[in-house]
Amino acid sequence: MEKLTRVFERYQEYVRTSPAAASHLESTVRALSYLIAGRFSDSHEISELVYSASNLLVLLNDGILRKNLSRTLPMSISQQKLLTWLSVLEYVEVFVEMAAAKMWGDAGRWLVIVLIQIAKAVLRCLLLFWYKSGIQTSPPIIPLDRDSQLCSQDNNEEEDDEDSSFVGQRSGRVVRPLGSAPSLQSRLWGLPRKKKVSRNQEEELHSSPTPLGLQETIAESLYIARPLLHLASLGICGKRSWKPWILSGLLEITSFSLLSDMKALNRRERAEMRRRAFLLLYYLLRSPFYDRYSETKILFLLRFLADYVPGVGLVARPLMEYLPIWQKIYFYNWG
């Protein structure tokens, strides 16, 4: 156990001192997940495992960097833990579904799906009603904007040097005294840089969730309950019935309509509302609508583009092969 602790401490130090290398590692792991897909048997499961690992790696590294930059999330420790667990569930849900189907068959797969959706609904209800977290975002913990954060840290470290410079009264030139100059190797041959603070960064760090009234709370509750109601409808009416598709769509549209009346949203909440509006288009790709109407048209369009538009085939043909697999995964479609 002590050995694992030392290894983790070394890894934390590595991330703190080399954030660019950590980002490169995350990108490499994610690219590896794309390269694995379709290469051999069970490649889709392994590809999804690697992709989930890349997301968890980003979550871990962001947590390390936030501590190093003193950029803690504006909430209690218990709320942060709930958000972290919710993020982990969202990152691994597809792989867990695929693994359950492989190990325990269709019955085990649906049991795992129901358990994950119940766990997510419980966590979101706690965040909504106990912690008053407002509109739930996805992912629950927004990834750290490392470029702006690290740039802000560099500017803070140079603040003393900036204070020691002065501006000539007549010429208006910014002059740095010789005593405050850095070493020759790290010297910059330009004007001292001014401290820049990103408005978006400050808003993201310090803005509190927009308080929800009764109407908005009902709307968000509908959004949280939608997956469970959809699963219950699937169990009662069957996979080929239109009723689960219609019920889910009505709940999502109702929730979105009630929330769209809110005006004073912060930046993250506005982004979440745009994401939810875009995800309404997913109903064109969800069965039974996809099976009866969308499938033939989408495949025809992809085949036409692959045959007649140079270069598009590199993307269109793998997409045509992957669409049937994508349709079989619940969390790809309905998660």
UniProtKB/Swiss-Prot annotation:
Positions of region (Required for peroxisomal location): 66-81
**Record keywords, A-Z:** Membrane, Peroxisome, Peroxisome biogenesis, Transmembrane, Transmembrane helix
Q: Which Pfam families match?
A: Pex16
Q: How does it sit in the membrane?
A: Multi-pass membrane protein
Positions of transmembrane segments: 81-101, 110-130
Q: What does this protein do?
A: Involved in peroxisome biogenesis.
Q: What is this protein called?
A: Peroxisomal membrane protein PEX16
User: Lineage from the top down?
Assistant: Eukaryota, Metazoa, Chordata, Craniata, Vertebrata
